[in-house]
Amino acid sequence: MPKLKSHRGAAKRFRKTASGAIKRRGAYRNHILTKKSTKQKRHLRVEAGTLKPCDARLAERMLHGS
């Protein structure tokens, strides 16, 4: 039986930490940043954090190959 593949979209969006938690990136920081104020962009620089346990279970299932 072949190896299971990771869900490539999930592999690009989530990272597993050493403790096993799953980190994600925050939204609204990708493009069209010129119309956002400096204050808004500064507040968006804060780390987005980890997934909730119910979502982390789903993400782990998608990341099994990576």
Curated annotation (Swiss-Prot):
GO terms for cellular component: cytosolic large ribosomal subunit. The keyword Ribonucleoprotein applies. PROSITE patterns: RIBOSOMAL_L35 (PS00936). Keywords: Ribonucleoprotein, Ribosomal protein. Residues 1-48 are annotated as: Disordered. GO terms for molecular function: structural constituent of ribosome. Disulfide bonds: none annotated. One of its GO terms (biological process) is translation. It comes from the Bacteria. Residues 1-44 have a biased composition (Basic residues). Pfam families: Ribosomal_L35p. SUPFAM superfamilies: L35p-like. The keyword Ribosomal protein applies. Coiled coil: none annotated. PANTHER family: 54S RIBOSOMAL PROTEIN BL35M (PTHR33343), LARGE RIBOSOMAL SUBUNIT PROTEIN BL35M (PTHR33343:SF1). Belongs to the bacterial ribosomal protein bL35 family. This is Large ribosomal subunit protein bL35. It comes from Legionella pneumophila (strain Corby). The gene is rpmI.
